[in-house]
Amino acid sequence: MKRMIIDGKEISNRIKEEVKREIQEFGYKPRLAILMAGDDESSKVYANSKVKACESVGIEAKVYYFSEKEEDKFFDTLEKLNEDKDTHGIMIEMPLPKGFDVDKVYDTINPYKDVDCISNYNMGRLFAGKPLFVPCTPKAIIHILENTGVDLEGKHAVVIGRSNILGKPVAKLLLDKNCTVTVCHSKTKDLAYHTKQADVLVVAAGKMNLVRGDMVKEGVVLIDAGINVHEGKIYGDADFESIKDKASYVTPVPGGVGPVTTAMILKNTLEAFKYAVKSL
């Protein structure tokens, strides 16, 4: 049986080249605003890495920093960016500080600039089958699966995780691909019973080594969207070493879903730019 470790960086680079080419054809740089509140160091690193990725394809990006006490200023800036014709995409760097009104963020962000699809409006459109945007990580996961060439129709897909930004959307997207979908979560009894039935297994629970090799069947396609830091190293939710020789396709962490998610931020920013051009 064919076995392959999926190279997310290679897939990401192809997407970036496509985005860069389209931007050059437009002859105008899209602009992305990233709003971040609080002093979480990892969030700062993620935000700055997004800026670098944007610059590599010709997108202008700026990070707006706010202290955890500047909630009013945060929302004032968000509303101004909503109306700014020169700002095409807006991202909110999560998590926001405790006490921030996250529901207000979901209600306030301009849906046509909401490149990570966090607004209530965009989530509704996604589940109605008429999305303006698809959340970046679920979009990356589906792109990776399509890139394998595996026919998803009729496959049993198991998703571990039910967050609004990852688990639920990716389950919906897999349904759209005509998979039979099972969603597992922290209250699921006998997780291994479900994972052993999966033709496609998407792990997005945020718990290191949640899935081991003895919990999957031979030939499974495993997409690991987990990010866990342990003793200074990054790990996924699946025990890669015990799974890599059993899976037909598997994403490593790091180097799997992460780079493709970053590329999808760029792609969605380009889509937001196109919406703005159409409205002129």
Curated annotation (Swiss-Prot):
Q: Which UniProt keywords apply?
A: Amino-acid biosynthesis, Histidine biosynthesis, Hydrolase, Methionine biosynthesis, Multifunctional enzyme, NADP, One-carbon metabolism, Oxidoreductase, Purine biosynthesis
Per the UniProt entry, the Enzyme Commission number(s) are 1.5.1.5, 3.5.4.9
What Gene Ontology molecular function terms does this protein carry?
methenyltetrahydrofolate cyclohydrolase activity; methylenetetrahydrofolate dehydrogenase (NADP+) activity
Q: Where does NADP(+) bind?
A: 161-163, 186, 227
Q: Extract the SUPFAM superfamilies matched here.
A: Aminoacid dehydrogenase-like, N-terminal domain (SSF53223), NAD(P)-binding Rossmann-fold domains (SSF51735)
GO annotations of cellular component type: cytosol
> In which domain of life is the source organism classified?
Bacteria
Please list the GO biological process terms of this entry: L-histidine biosynthetic process; methionine biosynthetic process; purine nucleotide biosynthetic process; tetrahydrofolate interconversion
**Pathway where this protein functions:** One-carbon metabolism; tetrahydrofolate interconversion
Q: Which reaction does it catalyse?
A: (6R)-5,10-methylene-5,6,7,8-tetrahydrofolate + NADP(+) = (6R)-5,10-methenyltetrahydrofolate + NADPH; (6R)-5,10-methenyltetrahydrofolate + H2O = (6R)-10-formyltetrahydrofolate + H(+)
Q: What does this protein do?
A: Catalyzes the oxidation of 5,10-methylenetetrahydrofolate to 5,10-methenyltetrahydrofolate and then the hydrolysis of 5,10-methenyltetrahydrofolate to 10-formyltetrahydrofolate.
Q: Subunit arrangement?
A: Homodimer.
Q: Which family does it belong to?
A: Belongs to the tetrahydrofolate dehydrogenase/cyclohydrolase family.
Name of the molecule in the record: Bifunctional protein FolD
Source taxonomy lineage?
Bacteria, Bacillati, Bacillota, Clostridia, Thermoanaerobacterales
